[in-house]
Structures are given as C-alpha cells and as structure tokens.
Curated annotation (Swiss-Prot):
The gene is ytfE. GO terms for biological process: protein repair; response to nitrosative stress; response to oxidative stress. InterPro entries: FeS-repair_YftE, Hemerythrin-like, RIC_family. One of its GO terms (cellular component) is cytoplasm. Di-iron-containing protein involved in the repair of iron-sulfur clusters damaged by oxidative and nitrosative stress conditions. One of its GO terms (molecular function) is metal ion binding. PANTHER family: IRON-SULFUR CLUSTER REPAIR PROTEIN YTFE (PTHR36438:SF1). NCBIfam families: FeS_repair_RIC (TIGR03652), PRK10992.1 (NF008221). It comes from the Bacteria. It is found in: Cytoplasm. It comes from Yersinia pseudotuberculosis serotype IB (strain PB1/+). Belongs to the RIC family. YtfE subfamily. This is Iron-sulfur cluster repair protein YtfE.
Length: 221
C-alpha cells in the first residue's frame, strides 16, 4: 500500500494505532494533518521506508478502536466532549498547580522550566473558551443538521487549534521536549508525565475534529 503520498490525517483515520507512531516521531497529524507522510518525513529527516514498514505492520494488527467514519456525528460529538473536553478541564488546572510548585521550589536550577506555569495557564484559559464555543455554538449546529452551513465557525475553530498547537511547541521548548532532568523530584516527574498525557490527548482530540468531524459536517452528513 502507498502510505507516503497519503495525508497524515487520512492515515491516522485509517490506522488508529498510527497516532502513537506519529507522536513518537514528532509528526503532527492533527493541525498538520493535511500534509503527506512523505513531506512531513522529509521535513524531519525521517526514513520514509521505515515509516511505511511500521505503518504496514500496524495495519495488520487487530484493534478495537471505534470506527468514527461510520458513527453518527452526534455520537462522535458526545465522545469528544466526554473523552477530551471533560478530561482537559481536569488535567490543566492540576498541571498549572504542579508547574507553579516546581518553579517555586526549583527556580534557581538551570534546568527549571521557568515560564511553564504561565504558558499552561494561558492554554487553560484559551482552551476553556474554545471548548465552550464548540459546545454552545458549533456542535449544536452540527447536531441540528446544519454542518454544511458551519464553514465560518469551523474555520475559526481550526485556527484556534493551530494556535494551541503553537503553544504546545513552547511547552516542549521550556521542558526539553517534556524530559525531566536527572535528579528531578517526584512532583517534577509527575508534572512532565501529566504534560505528555495532555499533549497526547489534545492531539487525538484535534485530529478527530479537524480530520473527521469537521469534514463530515461540511459534507452535510
């Protein structure tokens, strides 16, 4: 199968386990989901043949992931809210508190991620507003069968997805790609574990919206 000329978003839909592989290689399948595997791999100097072999192996593995290409959009929306929106509302406040503690206790160390708490607070504020707009405006439009008329709100939501993607890059820079330094305390390690989980969740969340929900809604499904 020709994987290299397919978009990252299409591959993530067709091979659900591919999202973990893409994350390992820093391949942006959510906000950058429209670029082909070949183009994305070339940007990062990745071995395209090795990536295709890994994707081929993943495609033969059995999996139990929901096929959201076939499910009604109302079901997909309910899943996004319960699995991702509600989860982000739990994750981010705790991450902010832990980041504040790490900066307060370890602020004099050169490895301290100074500015991380402020960046996470900004993500919390902006993502909270973003999810509210989706739940109060865009999702009800789609649920009422008006998705084909929602190009304006969808454009805004995708732009906000791009913005939070840039904020995640700042978080990665502040945390040495979310890697705790040698000798990091338990709070520091727990913070970075939580950030990694949040990034994984958010990328899957944006992928489902950008590459599945929004295109299907615009087609009038």
């Amino acid at each position: 199968m020709d994987y290299r000329n397919q978009s990252l978003g299409a591959l993530a839909i067709a091979i659900p386990q591919a999202t973990k592989l893409f994350r390992q290689h820093q391949l942006d399948f959510c906000c950058g989901g429209k670029q082909t595997l070949l183009r994305a791999a070339n940007k990062l100097n990745l071995d395209i043949d090795a990536l295709e072999a890994q994707l081929s192996a993943l495609q033969t593995e059995p999996h139990s992931s929901e096929d959201w290409q076939q499910q009604p959009l109302t079901n997909l929306i309910s899943f996004i809210i319960s699995r991702y929106h509600d989860r982000h509302r739990e994750q981010l406040p705790e991450l902010v508190l832990m980041a504040e503690k790490v900066e307060r206790v370890h602020g004099e160390k050169p490895t301290c991620p100074r500015g991380l708490a402020a960046e996470l607070s900004a993500i919390l504020e902006e993502l909270t507003q973003h999810m509210y707009k989706e739940e109060q405006i865009l999702f009800p439009m789609i649920q009422r069968g008006m998705g084909s008329q929602a190009s304006g709100p969808i454009f805004v939501m995708e732009a906000e997805h791009d913005a939070v993607g840039q904020q995640l890059e700042v978080v990665k820079q502040l945390t040495q790609n979310v890697t705790p330094p040698e000798g990091a305390c338990n709070t520091w390690r727990a913070l970075y574990t939580g950030i990694n989980e949040f990034i994984t969740d958010l990328m899957e969340h944006i992928h489902l919206e950008n590459n599945l929900l929004f295109p299907r809604a615009l087609r009038g499904e």
